[in-house]
Amino acid sequence: MADPKYADLPGIARNEPDVYETSDLPEDDQAEFDAEELTSTSVEHIIVNPNAAYDKFKDKKVGTRSLDFSDRITKSKRTGYESGEYEILGEGIGMKETPQQKYQRLLHEVQELTQEVEKTQSTVKESAAEEKLTPVALAKQVASLKQQLVSTHLEKLLGPDAAINLTDPDGALAKRLLTQLDAAKTRKNPEGKSPAKGPGPDTENLVTYELHCRPEQNKFSQAAKMAELEKRLGELEVAVRCDQDTQNPLTVGLQGSCLMDTVEILQAKVNLLDVASLDQVEARLQSVLGKMNEIAKHKAAIEDADTESKVHQLYETVQKWDSMSGTLPQVVQRLLTLKQLHEQAMQFGQLLTHLDTTQQMIANSLKDNTNALAMVQKAMKENLATVEDNFSNIDGRIKKLSK
């Protein structure tokens, strides 16, 4: 039961559930900081496409073999996830490339690079002279890289397992040929003993050589040589070719599509300068000069006739304008008056619209006032009848009390 001394205290809510409230937090804790969005250009905003990420990592698995993420109390390190560059490794994870595997990987990558360069040369046109690395130069560098890799003779140092039959068929073929030669040498007679003479050749000591030709490699080398030749011809044409001078008539038409066209044009012009043909050229030039003079005279007469016709047309236009210039001020004054009339008519229309709207508002107000007056009169009649009834009742009671 509640203590009776708190019964009559003010501000106590009775018959309501108890509410326990705590004081507010300090002002430092009440402050709310809105995180500002970084708009600096130094911050890179990366947009991740979930569909592309799913397609990239679909059907991929993470190797959990020999993994240990637990805490350690010893000095030995725990092994977590490992990542590295592309390597041709055997079974197991976390192994380092051996020299043989590194040699195999390099051969494989050089082979892939050669195929990509061949595709590029077959699809892409020869690049411009200002490009630093053309497909032709890239093909030469790839060939030199492959030759340098093969010339290191790493197969002798790394053992017979260094060759890859799939990525380097030439190396596999050479290895097979050397093996057959070694086997043939072992079957020969020892030194100092002459072979036995027989009626026919010894078929067991014969060695059969199979030579395989790669036409695509020959085509590639020929295409590289042709591309290099075309590049050098283009550079020579750029160096020999000069800009066409429009002021010099001797250089007109010398801008050929290639060096051979320019040489042919020059040869034709040199043939025209022969002594036997100079007289004919001079006679033709004299006839052409006479025709040019006649054309110039006719052209001057035609230009004079055109100028005279234009002057007549201009004079007729001025005459028409003189007749219209007298009526132009009156037309302008009428247009200004008509503009003022239109403006006044627009204002009058706006006033009529406002007056009509005001009249409708007044009519609605009068109608509302009439309805309100009728209701007031009806209420007054009812109240008056009620008052009369009350007075009659009071009079009756007074009479009863007086008796």
Swiss-Prot record:
Residues 99-132, 381-401 form a coiled coil. One of its GO terms (cellular component) is cytoplasm. Pfam families: Dynamitin (PF04912). One of its GO terms (biological process) is mitotic spindle organization. It is a peripheral membrane protein. It is found in: Cytoplasm, Cytoskeleton, Microtubule organizing center, Centrosome; Membrane; Cytoplasm, Cytoskeleton. Subunit of dynactin, a multiprotein complex part of a tripartite complex with dynein and a adapter, such as BICDL1, BICD2 or HOOK3. The dynactin complex is built around ACTR1A/ACTB filament and consists of an actin-related filament composed of a shoulder domain, a pointed end and a barbed end. Its length is defined by its flexible shoulder domain. The soulder is composed of 2 DCTN1 subunits, 4 DCTN2 and 2 DCTN3. Part of the dynactin complex that activates the molecular motor dynein for ultra-processive transport along microtubules. In the dynactin soulder domain, binds the ACTR1A filament and acts as a molecular ruler to determine the length. Modulates cytoplasmic dynein binding to an organelle, and plays a role in prometaphase chromosome alignment and spindle organization during mitosis. Involved in anchoring microtubules to centrosomes. Belongs to the dynactin subunit 2 family. This is Dynactin subunit 2-A. It comes from Xenopus laevis (African clawed frog).
